[in-house]
């Protein structure tokens, strides 16, 4: 879409932060209003992350107005909230391409702009990186400032607290801003507290505070009395004792939608020494009433009509794999009181809404804490329960040591329901589920299953849940199922595949939901088609049988080729000295950028035409 200067006259004056800082201060509220309307207009036409950005408009304007970006370095945690940042930093006219193939990256991305200091997508990394950047800036000696913006969800992760603990120890000059959009302490947001924030962030208070510490540092009783007095005074109106104990100078909470007040506070804080913590209160979805009322639904949106106030229903009548999992979970929980379900802040995405309502005492959302989620599951298993950890493939990476140390070594019966396996699409490199087969396959005693359709997914969930000799994993993709009939649940024989079609010369060994494409290729090439089902343990007998009866084999998976299921097939053949040629087809050795799932598969040769072309070229 073309930028409408008449509709956004103030925003039209700002195509860079240098131009922003030339605006008179009194025009900034109007700029914020136009920026919010432009964000609504753009994202509703193109799709993308929505509610978070609406809540950070004033903060973004204030930060770029006060700080000399890009010289001063601004780091956004996760990046869902950074659309206004992209608009103000030279990407205004391209915002309609965000999350699309060849368009703007969905998150801050170093290769896209000098304003994007840290490439992000996963949560809770900003403070750790910010400390390193602040230390480097201090050694550089050019008075470069460092600011990290982190949300109230991301700050719950252990990594954020590890970083703050370190910052309190080495005391770099940096500012951490907590964007709190839960409004959990909204009663503190008002004229008194805004005045207090400006007072506490001022140089007079700061100098008195630090000077008093130095004067009385040698008199422990007086030092302790002063500390307690200060905490008592601040504690009456400030909920920041935790951050103070970690070594930060805490300011807030303040109104995150008062751009003028934010500018005053940020100007005061810019020159303070040591780690600073500013707590701002915002409303997710601010300025668009439907998003304010339902920020979860409007977190990420498809194209929609803003005037309707609602999002279009998903196309197609087929359920998604997440719903298949959620239905199985509820069905099983109704029969087995030992089932416990765990998610690290992915209730909606993992299909667990209905379960959380029907079985609230057996549903555990541990927040953005993947490591804790996995070891918590270990504890439940030790206690005699049957934990199911529902987690995205890309986020399970964050708990790899816990999978090995706390579950696999102890052979605990924990089942991982791995959603978003394979190509995810619009969220790009940070969210593709490209590696789970590779990093799980090498773990002893792990059983790994790859369903080819929704019925097989249900059977595998049932099989994994009733397996008691160690951990299991069932991985399934983002998107709709295939429409096959659902049969009664029964346990599958562990480590056994099935032949779906008999052919000649070539056998295709398929792992997962690329089966429809594999079936088309097998038909076109008159090849044998095998649904391998299990990545671990592999059906070695079936693999050797296929090698003996065919001139060549091709493996197919939506996982990295390196270390994936195909690599396992190669290992079996080499161990048995079978010199049959094998073509491994899967995800290549690079990080896959954003685009639709269909676009990515076509470009990577993982649609039927691409798979057939790869095999023909290899056989030629």
Swiss-Prot record:
Which of UniProt's keywords are assigned here? Isoprene biosynthesis, Magnesium, Metal-binding, Thiamine biosynthesis, Thiamine pyrophosphate, Transferase
Q: Name one GO cellular component term.
A: cytosol
InterPro entries assigned to the protein according to its UniProt record, in alphabetical order: Dxylulose-5-P_synthase, THDP-binding, Transketo_C/PFOR_II, Transketolase-like_Pyr-bd, Transketolase_BS, Transketolase_C, Transketolase_CS
Q: Which residues bind thiamine diphosphate?
A: 80, 121-123, 153-154, 181, 288, 370
- A Pfam family it matches: DXP_synthase_N
- A GO molecular function for this record? magnesium ion binding
Per UniProt, Mg(2+) binds at: 152, 181
Q: What is its EC number?
A: 2.2.1.7
The pathway that the record names for this protein is: Metabolic intermediate biosynthesis; 1-deoxy-D-xylulose 5-phosphate biosynthesis; 1-deoxy-D-xylulose 5-phosphate from D-glyceraldehyde 3-phosphate and pyruvate: step 1/1
Catalytic activity reads: D-glyceraldehyde 3-phosphate + pyruvate + H(+) = 1-deoxy-D-xylulose 5-phosphate + CO2
Q: Which cofactor does it need?
A: Mg(2+); thiamine diphosphate
Q: Name any Gene Ontology BP term.
A: terpenoid biosynthetic process
| Cofactor binding remark | Binds 1 Mg(2+) ion per subunit.
Name the family.
Answer: Belongs to the transketolase family. DXPS subfamily.
Function of this protein? Catalyzes the acyloin condensation reaction between C atoms 2 and 3 of pyruvate and glyceraldehyde 3-phosphate to yield 1-deoxy-D-xylulose-5-phosphate (DXP).
Q: Return the PANTHER family for the record.
A: 1-D-DEOXYXYLULOSE 5-PHOSPHATE SYNTHASE-RELATED, 1-DEOXY-D-XYLULOSE-5-PHOSPHATE SYNTHASE, CHLOROPLASTIC
Subunit info? Homodimer.
Name-wise, this protein is 1-deoxy-D-xylulose-5-phosphate synthase
Q: Which organism is it from?
A: Salmonella arizonae (strain ATCC BAA-731 / CDC346-86 / RSK2980)
The gene from which this protein is expressed is: dxs
């Amino acid at each position: 879409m073309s930028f409408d200067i008449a509709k956004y006259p103030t925003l039209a004056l700002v195509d860079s932060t240098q131009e922003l800082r030339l605006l008179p201060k009194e025009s900034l509220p109007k700029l914020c209003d136009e920026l919010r309307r432009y964000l609504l207009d753009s994202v509703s036409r193109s799709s993308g992350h929505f509610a978070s950005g609406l809540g950070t408009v004033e903060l973004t304007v204030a930060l770029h107005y006060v700080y000399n970006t890009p010289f001063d370095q601004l780091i956004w945690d996760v990046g869902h909230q950074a659309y206004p940042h992209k608009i103000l930093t030279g990407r205004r006219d391209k915002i309609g391409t965000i999350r699309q193939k060849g368009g703007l990256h969905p998150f801050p991305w170093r290769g896209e702009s000098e304003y994007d200091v840290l490439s992000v997508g996963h949560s809770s990394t900003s403070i750790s990186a910010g400390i390193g950047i602040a230390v480097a800036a201090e050694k550089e000696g050019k008075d470069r400032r460092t600011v990290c913006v982190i949300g109230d969800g991301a700050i719950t992760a252990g990594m954020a607290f590890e970083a703050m603990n370190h910052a309190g120890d080495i005391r770099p000059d940096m500012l951490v801003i907590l964007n709190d959009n839960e409004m959990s302490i909204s009663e503190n947001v008002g004229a008194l507290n805004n005045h207090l924030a400006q007072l506490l962030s001022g140089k007079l208070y700061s100098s008195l505070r630090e000077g008093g510490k130095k004067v009385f540092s040698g008199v422990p009783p007086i030092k302790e009395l002063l500390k307690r007095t200060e905490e008592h005074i601040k504690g009456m109106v400030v909920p920041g004792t935790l951050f103070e104990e970690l070594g930060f100078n805490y300011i807030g909470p303040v109104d995150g939608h008062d751009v003028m007040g934010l500018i005053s506070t940020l100007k005061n804080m810019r020159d303070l020494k040591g780690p600073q913590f500013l707590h701002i209160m915002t409303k997710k979805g601010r300025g668009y009433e439907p998003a304010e009322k339902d920020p979860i639904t409007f977190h990420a949106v498809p194209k929609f009509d803003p005037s309707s106030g609602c999002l279009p229903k998903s196309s197609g009548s087929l359920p998604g794999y997440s719903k298949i999992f959620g239905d199985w979970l509820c069905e099983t929980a109704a029969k087995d009181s030992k089932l416990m379900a765990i998610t690290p802040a992915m209730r909606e995405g993992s299909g667990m809404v209905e379960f959380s309502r029907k079985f609230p005492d057996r549903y555990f959302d541990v927040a953005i804490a993947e490591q804790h989620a996995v070891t918590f599951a270990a504890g439940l298993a030790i206690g005699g329960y049957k934990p199911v950890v529902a987690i995205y493939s890309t986020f399970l990476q964050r708990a790899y040591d816990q999978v090995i140390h706390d579950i696999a070594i102890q052979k605990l019966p924990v089942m991982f329901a791995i959603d978003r396996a394979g190509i995810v699409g619009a969220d790009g490199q940070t969210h593709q589920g490209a590696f789970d087969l590779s990093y799980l396959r090498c773990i002893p005693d792990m059983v790994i299953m790859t369903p080819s359709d929704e019925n097989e997914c249900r059977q595998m969930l049932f099989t994994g849940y009733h397996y008691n000799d160690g951990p299991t994993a069932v991985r399934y993709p983002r998107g709709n199922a295939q429409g096959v009939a659902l049969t009664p649940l029964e346990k599958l024989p562990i480590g056994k595949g099935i032949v779906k079609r008999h052919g000649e010369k070539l056998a295709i060994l398929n792992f997962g939901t690329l089966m429809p494409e594999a079936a088309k290729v097998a038909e076109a090439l008159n090849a044998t088609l095998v649904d391998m089902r299990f990545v671990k343990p592999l059906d070695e007998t079936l693999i050797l049988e296929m090698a003996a009866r065919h001139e060549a084999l091709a493996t197919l998976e939506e996982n990295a080729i390196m270390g994936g299921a195909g690599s396992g097939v190669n290992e079996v053949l080499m161990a048995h000295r079978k010199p049959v040629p094998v073509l491994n087809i899967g995800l290549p050795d690079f990080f896959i950028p954003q685009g639709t799932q269909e676009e990515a598969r076509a470009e990577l040769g993982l649609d039927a035409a691409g798979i057939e072309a790869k095999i023909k070229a290899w056989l030629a």
